[in-house]
A protein has these predicted regions:
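A cross-family phosphate/adenosyl-ligand binding-site feature
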Residues: 2-140, 148-218
Length: 218
């Protein structure tokens, strides 16, 4: 990459991120996403918000306990970059459009959170921060985790997308033949970050295939 292109990429890369996690299964994906942004030198600030339901899911899936030091528990180390916010603090910095948050990721995003965001119900910080992203035309990525989907879920995804959000379902890739759940979570997190302008150097990239089987693609 030429120096000028690299400088342009650095200038355009989001430096101030909001990451929210809600009460849908998939806490391991959050852990990998946080680890990636914590080590990414392009990212300067990360505001992390978790719902009460998310804390329960994290406790059950990752065997972590308590509301305090959630960042340290998820990362396994202290972080100067990632700051935990209370979902009850509706007056936090990320609740205002004047605060320079560059993008927001909700991972995983429950269908309840999706419904509130899609319909402009902002009674907690997560929904308010998402509402701010929509009104300020900032990237908002909703990693919805639910199956099967009913008509209400689908309509809410359409409504959120129509308002400006990206619906990024929590569906991992299989074509790179992951051997572990950690590999799947890592690659999914890399794709989410690439979507907002933070491509990761160690992300898997499909290079096409050399047909040896003799079968034609359908």
């Amino acid at each position: 990459m030429h120096n000028s292109s690299r400088k342009t990429q650095l200038l355009n890369s989001p430096q101030n991120l909001t990451i929210a996690t809600t009460g849908a299964s998939g806490a391991i994906f959050l852990r990998h996403l946080l680890s990636l942004v914590d080590r990414d030198s392009r990212v300067r600030i990360v505001n992390l918000v978790s719902s009460d339901s998310a804390l329960r899911v994290i406790a059950e899936e990752l065997n972590l306990r308590g509301r305090t030091n959630l960042v340290g528990q998820l990362l396994g180390r202290a972080s100067r970059k990632v700051h935990q916010q209370s979902n009850a603090d509706i007056g936090a910095n990320i609740a205002s459009g004047s605060y320079p948050s560059d993008a927001m990721i909700v991972l995983p995003c429950s269908v309840g959170t999706l419904a509130r965001i899609a319909n402009g119900i902002a009674s907690h910080l997560i929904e308010r921060a998402a509402d701010v992203c929509l009104k300020e035309k900032r990237p908002l990525v909703l990693c919805v985790r639910e199956t099967p989907l009913n008509k209400i879920h689908i309509r809410n995804m359409y409504r959120a997308a129509d308002a400006g959000a990206t619906i990024f379902p929590l569906i991992p890739a299989y074509y790179f033949r992951p051997a572990t759940l950690d590999q799947m979570a890592h690659e999914f997190s890399c794709r989410v970050l690439a979507h907002i302008g933070l491509p990761q150097k160690d992300a898997y990239r499909w290079k096409g295939e050399t047909r040896k089987s003799g079968f034609n693609s359908v």
